[in-house]
Regions:
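Noncatalytic linker/hinge segments flanking ATPase motor cores
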Residues: 82-89, 131, 136, 198-206, ...
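Short, low-complexity, polar/charged sequence segments that are solvent-exposed and flexible
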Residues: 60-65, 103-108, 179-181, 194-199
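C-terminal/domain-edge helix-coil "capping" segments
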Residues: 16-33, 141, 145-218
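A structural "domain/chain start" motif
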Residues: 16-70, 75, 80-83, 90-99, ...
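Surface-exposed short loop/turn segments
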Residues: 88-166
Length: 218
């Protein structure tokens, strides 16, 4: 699917400036309070058949690290955990975005040299003259042209669902979050840290657009 958008929209989505940033829209709900006990967490894959994936194991460790920063501990198994956290993640094949933008053309707007010539008439007859005058040139925008940029925009989605555990039995859900991020990086592993950081920026009540700076190899 091809879309025509302005360059301003592209920059608004993928970020610009000396350090790239990941923009993530976060929506979260919770029954946790500042007085809620922390306890230990164990992260599982959603769907479960991803649990053997090396990619999932990497994200599992990163997500557990985020909980550690919030005062939780890492459980070695679901049977010994106080909470189980279901992690879902996905990235699409990308959408082609064609952007158009205006490029100014710079040139001389005034000044420089000018040639003059003419004829002078008097009582004794006439005489021709010619000469050149000079003034300091000034420069500015004298026109514009249109440029085109083509990018592939990827949609990345992360869902986190946290449940109480009682002797290994799953109980009530206490936290849920959905994070949607769009950008030109098509590798989930390159942006997952920034997405997790965005979700936990005001844990457990992060909502709205969150921007996290990062370094990427996409």
């Amino acid at each position: 699917m091809r879309l025509i958008v302005t360059l301003v929209m592209i920059f608004g989505i993928v970020g610009c400036g000396p350090q790239p940033r990941v923009q993530t829209n976060v929506d979260s709900f919770t029954t946790l309070t500042p007085l809620s006990e922390k306890g230990s967490v164990f992260v599982v894959a959603n769907p479960a058949d991803l649990s053997g994936s090396i990619e999932f194991k990497s994200y599992k460790s990163k997500l557990e690290d985020q909980f550690l920063k919030q005062g939780y501990s890492r459980a070695q198994s679901s049977s010994s955990a106080n909470f189980v956290v279901h992690l879902y993640y996905s990235i699409d094949d990308g959408q082609t975005i064609t952007s158009t933008y205006s490029v100014p053309i710079w040139g001389q707007t005034s000044g420089g040299s000018a040639s003059h010539s003419g004829t002078v008439y008097g009582g004794g007859g006439s005489a021709s003259y010619s000469g050149t005058t000079y003034s300091a040139p000034t420069y500015g925008v004298v026109g514009s042209t249109t440029g085109t940029s083509v990018n592939t925009l990827f949609s990345r989605i992360v869902r986190i669902d946290m449940f109480e555990l009682n002797e290994g039995v799953q109980g009530d859900k206490v936290f849920e979050a959905k994070a949607v991020s769009k950008g030109t990086c098509g590798s989930m592993s390159e942006v997952i840290d920034e997405i997790f950081t965005g979700v936990f920026q005001q844990f457990p009540n992060t909502r709205g657009l969150v921007e996290i700076p990062g370094e990427f190899n996409c």
